[in-house]
């Protein structure tokens, strides 16, 4: 099934477009969505991401995938805990990380044309750094937003923050994993 899905560029493009569309839909309508609907859309997104990421098992050696996953899990857990426990104000990081992410996207698209292994390596290193920062920033921001909603007694906001927070941290985790895998990866 995996070979059939990924042998068609149209299907791959459709999977990626569906993921992007769901992220944009969830982000744009979070204030209006019922929490159950938001979590349902997040679940659909996670399933689509799982199908898309399954290609790594055909490209990378299993040991490399395990190494990248272990490194990702350790880094992600450490940065999430740091974000939840730090007393420092991280709000200034938000715009810097967002601008860096836009630059990363531009560089990634440019490398589709240049096919430069050096640029691919630089993009991967930058991606790890950016998503480490986003993990720290998002963890802190989700904690602060949740605390504010709890103080206000807004249970609906707490549920919505939980759904969008899950999506943000999931995206941070997956992207961190993909960039770490790209750095340590031994292709078959």
Located regions from the model:
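A hydrophobic alpha-helical transmembrane-helix feature that marks the membrane cores
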Residues: 1-188
């Amino acid at each position: 099934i995996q070979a059939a899905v990924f042998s068609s560029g149209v299907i791959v493009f459709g999977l990626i477009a569906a993921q992007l569309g769901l992220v944009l839909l969830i982000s744009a309508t979070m204030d209006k969505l019922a929490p159950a609907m938001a979590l349902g859309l997040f679940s659909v997104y996670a399933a689509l991401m799982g199908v898309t990421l399954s290609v790594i098992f055909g490209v990378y050696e299993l040991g490399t995938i395990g190494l990248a996953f272990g490194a990702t899990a350790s880094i992600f857990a450490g940065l999430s805990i740091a974000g939840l426990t730090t007393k420092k104000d991280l709000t200034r990081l938000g715009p810097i990380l967002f601008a860096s992410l836009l630059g990363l996207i531009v560089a990634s698209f440019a490398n589709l044309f240049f096919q430069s292994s050096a640029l691919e390596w630089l993009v991967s290193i930058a991606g790890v750094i950016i998503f480490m920062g986003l993990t720290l920033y998002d963890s802190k921001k989700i904690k602060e937003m949740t605390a504010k909603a709890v103080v206000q007694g807004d249970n609906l906001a707490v549920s919505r923050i939980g759904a969008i927070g899950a999506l943000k941290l999931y995206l941070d985790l997956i992207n961190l994993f993909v960039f770490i895998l790209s750095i340590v990866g031994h292709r078959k």
